[in-house]
């Protein structure tokens, strides 16, 4: 069973013990729109630094190379390059027994990090990371900035205030874009291996915040939940976009877009072999269907201001609402 990283962490100063301690913010949000329960607890047993293996990289200091294992903690206020992280998730996500991993603090930077199975990189507000590679079973809890993260089966959880640019999602990796976060220039190569509109919500890109300029390739899937917005998305053959929230300026170059009940899609362009499906309760506005593209509007669906070009196809139920123009003029 796939493990789901859904915990953000920060360090706070404990005036009683005179040490930094770990605070975890548990935000349980399994796919398909489950509710969120937030709890805050101090794990005093994880005082930092408490073990000889725990290290602090001070501001202005640069450290290169090394491996974190066996619940080691690395607290980064300076710069760390080329670290391998293999600890932090041994007991699974949302488990207070987890004590290890890398903590990139305000002003800290971590570059070219490798996160293996059981490893966790935490990027707190004001921290930044680049060129991180995360394997299956590893994760990144992001409250700061991340550039060019590669998820090779790993997970990236974006908490409020986080910005992720250039994430590539491969091999059942998972990026969760929570409310108050922005993911830009993401490339999605996984999530739709089960076929078009298959029921899975824990691989690919899961959007409850803002996703901008996403590219969805073969086998890729973007799920836009009710509170989410996807802007300027390109979907290629074998990939799909599932919309329960808002999708703006999507281009279907052979890919599929499913607009579900409560979802809205505006200014979609359907090119050759692309397919926009507007389901019961879904709404599409200003769709352009080019040659060999296809628009399907199911019973109870709505598509307005459709532009149907020569060679494009429109398939609709008599119980759907459809208006637009084609080469013969207006239709409704």
Model regions and ranges:
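Long, low-complexity, polar and repeat-rich extracellular regions
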Residues: 1-332
């Amino acid at each position: 069973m796939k493990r789901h990283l859904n915990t953000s962490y920060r360090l706070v100063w404990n005036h009683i013990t005179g040490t930094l301690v770990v605070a975890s913010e548990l935000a349980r949000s399994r796919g398909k729109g489950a509710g969120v329960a937030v709890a805050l607890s101090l794990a005093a047993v994880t005082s930092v630094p408490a073990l000889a293996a725990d290290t602090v990289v001070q501001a202005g200091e640069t450290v290169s190379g090394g491996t974190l294992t066996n619940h080691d903690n690395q607290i980064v206020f300076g710069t760390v390059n080329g670290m391998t992280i293999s600890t932090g998730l041994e007991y699974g996500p949302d488990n207070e027994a987890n004590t290890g991993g890398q903590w990139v603090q305000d002003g800290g930077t971590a570059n070219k990090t490798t996160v293996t199975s059981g490893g966790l990189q935490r990027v707190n507000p004001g921290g930044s990371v680049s060129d991180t590679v995360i394997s299956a079973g590893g994760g990144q809890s992001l409250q700061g900035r991340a550039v060019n993260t590669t998820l090779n089966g790993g997970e990236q959880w974006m908490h409020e205030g986080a910005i992720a640019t250039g994430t590539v999602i491969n091999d059942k990796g998972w990026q969760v874009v929570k409310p108050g976060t922005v993911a830009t220039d993401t490339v999605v190569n996984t999530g739709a291996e089960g076929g078009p509109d298959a029921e899975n919500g824990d691989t690919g890109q899961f959007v409850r915040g803002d996703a901008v300029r996403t590219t969805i390739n073969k086998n890729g899937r973007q799920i836009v939940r009710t509170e989410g917005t996807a802007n300027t998305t390109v979907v290629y053959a074998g990939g799909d976009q599932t919309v329960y929230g808002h999708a703006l300026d999507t281009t279907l170059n052979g890919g599929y877009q499913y607009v579900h009940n409560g979802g809205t899609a505006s200014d979609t362009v359907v090119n050759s072999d692309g397919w926009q499906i507007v389901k019961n309760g879904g709404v599409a506005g200003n769709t352009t269907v080019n040659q060999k593209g296809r628009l399907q509007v199911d019973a109870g669906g709505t598509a307005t201001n459709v532009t149907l070009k020569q060679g494009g196809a429109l398939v609709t139920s008599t119980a759907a609402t459809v208006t637009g123009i084609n080469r013969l003029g207006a239709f409704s």
